[in-house]
Amino acid sequence: MPFINIKLVPENGGPTNEQKQQLIEGVSDLMVKVLNKNKASIVVIIDEVDSNNYGLGGESVHHLRQKN
């Protein structure tokens, strides 16, 4: 059973539920096309990571966004 985990730091209120559905469909279709997996067995989980809980270069993404 393929297990795909997508981690996103939401920006400007997104992604929307429709965009998440499109991601789930698109990633599943890609697994079928590239790896010949059974679509019914593909698990996709989308984790939305708060910008305070993710860092880059020693600074939280939240802090980096405030600087810009």
UniProtKB/Swiss-Prot annotation:
For this chain, the annotated S-S bridges are none
* Keywords from the named record: Isomerase
Q: Which InterPro entries match?
A: 4-OT, 4-OT-like_dom, Tautomerase/MIF_sf
Q: Which Pfam families match?
A: Tautomerase
What EC number(s) has UniProt assigned to this enzyme?
5.3.2.-
Name the SUPFAM superfamilies on file: Tautomerase/MIF
Top-level taxon:
Bacteria
Which is one GO molecular function term here? isomerase activity
Q: Which residues form the active site?
A: P2 (proton acceptor)
Enumerate the transmembrane spans: none
Q: Which family does it belong to?
A: Belongs to the 4-oxalocrotonate tautomerase family.
Q: Mind telling me which PANTHER family this protein's record contains?
A: 2-HYDROXYMUCONATE TAUTOMERASE (PTHR35530:SF1), TAUTOMERASE-RELATED (PTHR35530)
Record protein name field: Probable tautomerase HP_0924
Q: Which organism is it from?
A: Helicobacter pylori (strain ATCC 700392 / 26695) (Campylobacter pylori)
